[in-house]
């Protein structure tokens, strides 16, 4: 995403300047030529399996594989210990610029042992994953990749993505290969669900060997949970366990997990073995902090961030909020309650719970919305900017229409569906902080370059609001234009 989808290469330049890598590898120089040209690589060895761009000074990868192992390699391997740096992993930038997290061997191996203890079924049958999640982020690159290594499983790389133009590849792959566990982010399930509901062959293949459905990376709207459950029962005659966990790049990544049956989205379980969790009052919410062998020692060449990462008892502070699933029984786990930095106050001083409100309204408007930005800081009411789910919109429209975001955003059936759905949602709310009074449908995709969306599909609420200030202003005009849906 940083090198092929980007237009300004801002993130990859930032990463290269921070890391000063001694070696950069690309499979082929041709697709990466512009990105490589944007970097200062005069003192960096460039290695490639193919050099279609004919860049001077490139080291062929085949030459490296001809090197004979010797004492130097043996010594390097022998020097590896628990606190040796295994990799640098950048955060996804969900709430700010990506941070360079130190990942040690202790972190990665401890986390896999923790998962093995709470998911003993992993040892009962060969593990098979079909996975698109990027390896430059901790969900795909640590959690899933290392899970396959730990359990000697099979990893099928899915070239698809949760986008209308790319989800077709995922559908083809899942029709051919039946996973035993399926990992995805909510955006991935949103893109895949309509295909599972309408393609019996896909559903049969998908559920044939499936032992568990897992989501993480963001909160899953309850309607997606219910639709997944329904298609599983329709296809197999039984419910497939659905679960989640919570963690960050700094926790390698899992810190909590729901290793028991749950019946709703949002529950992130209890601390993994060896993990201590501290719950701290934070205004009207409860902040979660964590320590354990899977927690990072800090950030690379970012001493200021490292100094702020932990509290005086060495608990890492991720800035997330939680609440008990059952206040009378902590063993029932905790529920993710949003990111503290995303919440804001209305003019009345009332806090708006952005994370909970966002997933609630997305569920209420199912199946037509893909994602949303909640707005209204220092305003009299809450508004919402939203992106359409193209497949979901088409399922509601009987006649032929132009298949573009702009045409669907102006279609009366879609607008009426949203107006009615949000109206029903509002009627169930007790206060102004969880009622949406205006909606504006966005017709341009969120920008990776502007850090508006991460490459795992999570919307950075704060940066998206800043980038779309003009759209936010339209929401709160005294007399809004016709594109704004007034509830």
Task: Give, region by region, the residue ranges found by the protein language model.
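Conserved ATP-dependent adenylate/AMP-binding module captured primarily in the ANL superfamily
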Residues: 4-39, 66-70, 111-130, 163-180
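Conserved pre-ATP/AMP-binding loop-to-beta segment of ANL
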Residues: 46-49, 53-90, 97, 121-128
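Gly/Ser/Thr-rich phosphate-binding loop
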Residues: 63, 151, 171, 180-184, ...
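ATP phosphate-binding P-loop of adenylate-forming
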Residues: 83-101, 112, 116, 246
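Conserved AMP-binding/adenylation subdomain of ANL enzymes
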Residues: 109-128, 135-201
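Conserved ATP-binding/catalytic segment of the ANL
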Residues: 286-346, 484
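Adenylate-forming
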Residues: 295, 329-360, 393-412, 432-433, ...
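Conserved C-terminal "lid"/linker of ANL adenylate-forming enzymes
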Residues: 344, 370-375, 380, 386, ...
């Amino acid at each position: 995403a940083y090198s092929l989808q980007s237009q300004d290469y801002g993130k990859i330049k930032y990463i290269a300047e921070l890391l000063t890598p001694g070696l950069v590898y690309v499979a082929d120089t041709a697709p990466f030529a512009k990105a490589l040209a944007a970097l200062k690589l005069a003192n960096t060895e460039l290695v490639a399996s193919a050099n279609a761009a004919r860049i001077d000074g490139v080291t062929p990868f085949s030459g490296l594989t001809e090197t004979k192992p010797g004492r130097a390699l043996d010594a390097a391997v022998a020097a590896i210990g628990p606190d040796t740096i295994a990799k640098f992993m950048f955060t996804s930038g969900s709430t700010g610029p990506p941070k360079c997290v130190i990942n040690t061997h202790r972190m990665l191996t401890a986390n896999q042992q923790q998962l093995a203890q709470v998911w003993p079924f992993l040892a009962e049958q060969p593990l098979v994953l079909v996975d698109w999640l990027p390896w430059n982020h901790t969900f795909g690159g640590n959690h899933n990749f290392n899970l396959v290594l730990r359990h000697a499983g099979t990893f099928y790389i899915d070239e698809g993505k949760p986008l209308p133009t790319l989800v077709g590849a995922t559908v083809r792959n899942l029709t051919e290969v039946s996973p035993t566990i399926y990992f995805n982010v909510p955006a991935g399930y949103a893109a895949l669900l309509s295909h599972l509901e309408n393609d019996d062959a896909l559903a049969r293949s998908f559920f044939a060997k499936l032992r568990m459905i897992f989501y993480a990376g963001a909160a899953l709207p309850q309607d997606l949970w219910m639709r997944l459950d329904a298609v599983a029962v329709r296809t197999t005659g039984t419910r497939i366990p659905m679960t989640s966990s919570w963690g960050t790049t700094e926790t390698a990544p899992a810190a909590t997990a729901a290793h028991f049956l749950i019946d709703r989205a949002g529950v992130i379980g209890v601390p993994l073995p060896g993990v201590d969790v501290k719950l701290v009052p934070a205004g009207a919410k409860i902040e979660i902090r964590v320590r354990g062998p899977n927690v990072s020692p800090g950030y690379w060449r970012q001493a200021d961030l490292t100094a702020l990462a932990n509290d005086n008892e060495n608990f890492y502070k991720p800035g997330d909020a939680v609440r008990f699933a059952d206040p009378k029984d902590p063993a029932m786990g905790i529920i993710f309650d949003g990111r503290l930095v995303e919440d804001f106050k209305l003019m009345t001083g009332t806090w708006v719970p952005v994370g909970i409100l966002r997933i609630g309204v997305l569920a209420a408007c199912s199946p037509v919305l893909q994602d949303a930005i909640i707005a209204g800081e220092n305003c009299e009411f809450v508004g919402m900017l939203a992106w359409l789910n193209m497949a979901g919109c088409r399922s509601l429209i009987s006649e032929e229409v132009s298949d573009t975001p702009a045409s669907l955003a102006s279609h009366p059936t879609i607008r009426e569906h949203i107006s009615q759905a949000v109206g029903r949602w509002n009627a169930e709310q007790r206060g102004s902080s969880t009622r949406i009074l205006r909606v504006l449908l966005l017709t341009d995709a969120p920008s990776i370059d502007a850090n508006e969306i991460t490459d795992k599909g999570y919307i950075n609420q704060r940066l998206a609001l800043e980038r779309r200030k003009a759209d936010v202003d339209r929401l709160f005009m005294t007399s809004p234009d016709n594109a704004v849906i007034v509830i």
